[in-house]
């Protein structure tokens, strides 16, 4: 029997988006508690998966992403808001989309030795699983634009 595995950093990215989403939903509930709850969930394998499917996350990558987002949250929100088109209202941005953008932009700009194209592809894949079609294109577009503006890709 083969065991399906997903890259530990990919799982850490998903978990970081979950943590930020939960933080927004719970009105800025203590981030440390949210991180501990999410880590406990992943460690206890309480996520409903097929028997031959294993997931584990890079704890260090998860913690680094979440902490970096909180250290840079005002700057991240400013970057997001500055990249919205006139028809997009930052106040009405879906919570999950904002959480995903905060984490992805943070990794892209502040805390990654991973090539920008890999980061963009990873978060576009995550968006594909979590968001609607229009939002997926928006995530890909905004990350690509931010990477180009910051000389992360040519």
UniProtKB/Swiss-Prot annotation:
InterPro entries per record: NusB-like_sf, NusB_fam, NusB_RsmB_TIM44
GO terms under cellular component: cytosol
Record-level GO BP terms: DNA-templated transcription termination; transcription antitermination
Name recorded for this polypeptide: Transcription antitermination protein NusB
The organism of origin for this protein: Rickettsia typhi (strain ATCC VR-144 / Wilmington)
Protein function: Involved in transcription antitermination. Required for transcription of ribosomal RNA (rRNA) genes. Binds specifically to the boxA antiterminator sequence of the ribosomal RNA (rrn) operons.
Family: Belongs to the NusB family.
GO molecular function, one term: RNA binding
One of the Pfam families matching this protein, by short name: NusB
Keyword annotations: RNA-binding, Transcription, Transcription antitermination, Transcription regulation
Gene that produces this protein: nusB
Domain of life: Bacteria
């Amino acid at each position: 029997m083969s065991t399906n595995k997903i890259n530990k950093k990919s799982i850490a990215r998903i978990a970081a988006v979950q943590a930020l989403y939960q933080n927004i939903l719970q009105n800025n509930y203590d981030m440390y508690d949210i991180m501990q709850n999410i880590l406990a969930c992943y460690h206890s394998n309480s996520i409903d998966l097929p028997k031959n499917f294993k997931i584990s996350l890079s704890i260090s990558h998860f913690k680094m992403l979440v902490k970096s987002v909180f250290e840079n949250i005002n700057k991240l929100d400013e970057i997001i808001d500055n990249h919205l088109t006139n028809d997009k209202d930052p106040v009405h941005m879906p919570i999950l989309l904002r959480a995903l953008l905060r984490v992805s932009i943070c990794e892209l700009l502040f805390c990654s030795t991973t090539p920008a194209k890999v980061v963009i592809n990873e978060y576009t894949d995550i968006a594909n699983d979590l968001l609607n079609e229009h939002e997926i294109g928006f995530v890909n577009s905004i990350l690509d634009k931010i990477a180009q503006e910051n000389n992360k890709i040519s």
